[in-house]
């Protein structure tokens, strides 16, 4: 069995500053790039499939050459066998639709059709959640979203998934789909390794991946638009039908503090402060 996990590099909003140009496009400046945190459940799902069903795991991303570090991190997370980076200027500034076209073409260009493609439910910089479903549409594959648990039957060529019903976090439905299929994981996804052999396989794969991740560039294939035979008019900024009408900062609510002024020279008031602090600290 072969799986592909899609991941993306996003600005580390804890470090540096980002801005937007006059067309509403994100300018990262010197802000560091990190792996999209919402991709982690997808990586866990792919790792579970590899441990329990065998086969190979690949990771694919679209972005600038600097995304190699993001792919290395993903390789360590999913114990990936190989990496794919889709990268050139023609692909830059793509919206979700142009991204989906590019990524779907990259998947179709692989030497072997994968059985499963995994994606996180949204990116930290875009927040739309469109790219995964749109990529599934371009591939013309079954799509299962909000997945929290997964079992794959390679002999039957099917997957059985538990998914959260949108709008009701307490309701879970079980669905079945034929392979190949596209899976969008929910943040609540947790892998399951019920058998001892699965846990041993997990340990062995971790040891194998340590050396491979240290030489991740030797296991990375980089494709530009010409390698994928993509028309520049249908990818990147030129192929993006989305128009950003404006970008507005989210106003921060004013901090509310319920403060009490005390006289530090008044023993009774200070004793009251000590009592109050003791209550918060778990005292009597």
Feature annotation, model-predicted:
Residues 13-15, 39-43, 67-69, 125-131:
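Short glycine/serine/threonine-rich phosphate/pyrophosphate-binding segments
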Residues 69-102, 106:
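A glycine-rich helix N-cap at a beta->alpha junction
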Residues 5, 59-61, 85, 119, ...:
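Structural beta-sheet core signal
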Residues 149-284:
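Electrostatically charged, flexible surface regions
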Residues 1-62:
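N-terminal beta-strand-loop-alpha-helix module at the start
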Residues 126-146:
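Short Gly/Thr/Asp-enriched flexible loops that form oxyanion-binding sites at enzyme active sites
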Residues 107-115:
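Glycine-rich phosphate-binding loop signature in dinucleotide/nucleotide-binding domains
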Residues 81, 115, 180:
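Conserved acidic residues
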């Amino acid at each position: 069995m072969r799986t592909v996990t899609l991941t993306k590099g996003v600005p580390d909003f804890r470090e540096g500053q980002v801005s937007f140009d006059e067309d509403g496009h994100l300018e990262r400046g010197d802000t560091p790039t990190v792996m999209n945190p919402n991709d982690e459940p997808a990586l866990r799902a792919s790792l579970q499939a590899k441990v329990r069903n065998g086969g190979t795991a690949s990771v694919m991303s679209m972005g600038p050459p600097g995304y190699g570090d993001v792919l290395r991190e993903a390789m360590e997370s999913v114990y990936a066998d190989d990496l794919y980076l889709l990268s050139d200027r023609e692909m830059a500034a793509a919206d979700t639709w142009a991204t989906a076209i590019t990524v779907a073409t990259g998947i179709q260009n692989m030497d072997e059709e994968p059985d499963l493609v995994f994606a996180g439910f949204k990116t930290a910089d875009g927040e739309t959640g469109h790219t995964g479903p749109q990529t599934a549409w371009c591939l013309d594959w079954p799509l299962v979203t909000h997945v929290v648990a997964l079992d794959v039957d390679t002999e039957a060529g099917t997957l059985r998934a538990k998914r959260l019903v949108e709008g009701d976090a307490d309701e879970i439905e079980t669905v079945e789909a034929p392979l190949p299929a596209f899976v969008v994981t929910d943040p609540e996804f947790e892998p399951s390794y019920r058998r001892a052999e699965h846990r041993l396989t997990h340990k062995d794969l971790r040891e194998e991946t340590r050396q491979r991740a240290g030489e991740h560039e030797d296991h990375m294939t980089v494709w530009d638009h010409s390698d994928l035979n993509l028309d520049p008019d249908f990818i990147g900024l030129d192929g993006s039908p989305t128009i950003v009408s404006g970008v507005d900062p989210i106003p921060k609510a004013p901090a509310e503090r319920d403060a009490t002024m005390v006289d530090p020279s008044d023993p009774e008031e200070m004793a009251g402060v000590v009592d109050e602090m003791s209550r918060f600290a778990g005292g009597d």
